[in-house]
Amino acid sequence: MSKAAIAEKEKFVDAFAEELKAAKAILVINYLGLTVEEVTNMRKELRDNDVKMKVIKNTYLRRAAAKAGIEGLDDTFVGPTAVIYTDNADDITEPARIVSKYEDDFDVIEIKGGMLEGKLTSKDEIKELASIPGREGVLSMLVSVLQAPIRDFAYAVKAVAESKDEDSAE
């Protein structure tokens, strides 16, 4: 292999290591068995939610993870591997939610493991995380809870006003 090709690959590994270092959530999956259309749809949904998906040789993944200071994921870099990651600190549950949905829809996807905010995470923890509502969901629940007492008070005032109108009409 030429020195230029080796330098190019090292440059790629270094760039990917920087992306992994900045990532708040990293998921490692086996995607073998998905059609091109299914992978394309999953990538689009991930991209729409500020999440990236890359399919990279396992050797490069190991090197990039080592350069990024990520330990414990080496055993997941076996077989067909895709890395799904985001640097969006606002919602680290989004990658887990999307991948979990696709895993439920297509039996061929397998979550191998991951890392969330620097902590090694198992497949079961990722599935559990996927069931937690995202930032927008939590905010809408909070707004609903805050509005409930005001709404109930408004209904009570309206009911009292209507009953007084009925009493005065009689």
Curated annotation (Swiss-Prot):
| InterPro entries, sorted | Ribosomal_uL10 (IPR001790), Ribosomal_uL10-like_sf (IPR043141), Ribosomal_uL10_bac (IPR022973), Ribosomal_uL10_bac_type (IPR047865), Ribosomal_uL10_CS_bac (IPR002363)
Its BP terms in the Gene Ontology are: translation
For molecular function, the Gene Ontology terms on record are: large ribosomal subunit rRNA binding; structural constituent of ribosome
- What are the alphabetically sorted keywords of the record? Ribonucleoprotein, Ribosomal protein, RNA-binding, rRNA-binding
Cited function = Forms part of the ribosomal stalk, playing a central role in the interaction of the ribosome with GTP-bound translation factors.
**Subunit text:** Part of the ribosomal stalk of the 50S ribosomal subunit. The N-terminus interacts with L11 and the large rRNA to form the base of the stalk. The C-terminus forms an elongated spine to which L12 dimers bind in a sequential fashion forming a multimeric L10(L12)X complex.
What is the recorded name of this protein? Large ribosomal subunit protein uL10
Q: Which organism is it from?
A: Lactobacillus helveticus (strain DPC 4571)
Question: What are the leading ranks of the lineage?
Answer: Bacteria, Bacillati, Bacillota, Bacilli, Lactobacillales
